[in-house]
């Protein structure tokens, strides 16, 4: 009877020798995290891993307890899923920042593809404005010379009919002086505009050369 008990206990221990009753821990294989899942629950050394189910998840269970201090630190540690979640949020935030930067750059470029094209367009516009200002200034100078020539002709006629044209000459001279004052103010304004355009053109040229 005792022999049968020992025989039964030996057979039971033999069956329990291949039983694996513990958590599945992650293992590294070709750089990937995976679990070996044994469907029949009988863990043996000759089990084929390819026939086992492959689960891409990491358990939160620890292999062995390391004291109360390790438990407190494990509460602060993140699981792999939480780390992936945090990383995904950081990637989304970085994407939003890059999108905002691209929008601000597109606003600065005013529809152009690059700063070089934007500066070339601005240079062309400034050049056109400068040429138009120069043309307007030339026309005003020619009108001013014509007014001076007209004044000289009127003065030469005074010698022929001084008494009859005295009043008319005075009124014409006053009108001419008013026109001259107005043209002088416009001339100074255009000169300031041209200098401002020249300064801006030089600054944009330097910025373009730096780019």
UniProtKB/Swiss-Prot annotation:
Signal sequence residues: 1-18
KW Endoplasmic reticulum (keyword) present: yes
Domain of life: Eukaryota
Compartments where located: Secreted; Golgi apparatus; Endoplasmic reticulum
InterPro entries reported in the protein's UniProt record: Fibin (IPR026772)
GO cellular component: endoplasmic reticulum; extracellular region; Golgi apparatus
Keyword annotations: Disulfide bond, Endoplasmic reticulum, Glycoprotein, Golgi apparatus, Secreted, Signal
Positions of glycan attachment: 30
Subunit record text: Homodimer; disulfide-linked. Seems to also exist as monomers.
PANTHER family on file: FIN BUD INITIATION FACTOR FIBIN, FIN BUD INITIATION FACTOR HOMOLOG
Family label: Belongs to the FIBIN family.
Designated name of the protein: Fin bud initiation factor homolog
Organism: Equus caballus
Chain's gene name: FIBIN
């Amino acid at each position: 009877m005792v022999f049968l008990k020992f025989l039964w206990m030996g057979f039971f221990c033999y069956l329990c020798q291949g039983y694996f009753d513990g958590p599945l821990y992650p293992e590294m294989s070709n750089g990937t995290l995976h679990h070996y899942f044994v469907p029949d629950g009988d863990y043996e050394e000759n089990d084929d891993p390819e026939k086992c189910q492959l689960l891409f998840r990491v358990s939160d269970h620890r292999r062995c307890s390391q004291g109360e201090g390790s438990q407190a630190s494990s509460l602060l540690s993140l699981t792999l899923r939480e780390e992936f979640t945090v990383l995904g949020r950081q990637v989304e935030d970085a994407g939003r920042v890059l999108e905002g930067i691209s929008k601000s750059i597109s606003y600065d470029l005013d529809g152009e593809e690059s700063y070089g094209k934007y500066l070339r367009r601005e240079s062309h516009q400034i050049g056109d404005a400068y040429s138009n200002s120069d043309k307007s200034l030339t026309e005003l100078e020619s009108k001013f010379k014509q007014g001076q020539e007209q004044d000289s002709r009127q003065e030469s006629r005074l010698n022929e009919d001084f008494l009859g044209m005295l009043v008319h000459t005075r009124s014409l001279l006053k009108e001419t002086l008013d026109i001259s004052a107005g043209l002088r103010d416009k001339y100074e304004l255009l000169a300031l505009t041209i200098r401002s355009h020249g300064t801006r053109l030089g600054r944009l040229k330097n910025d373009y050369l730096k780019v």
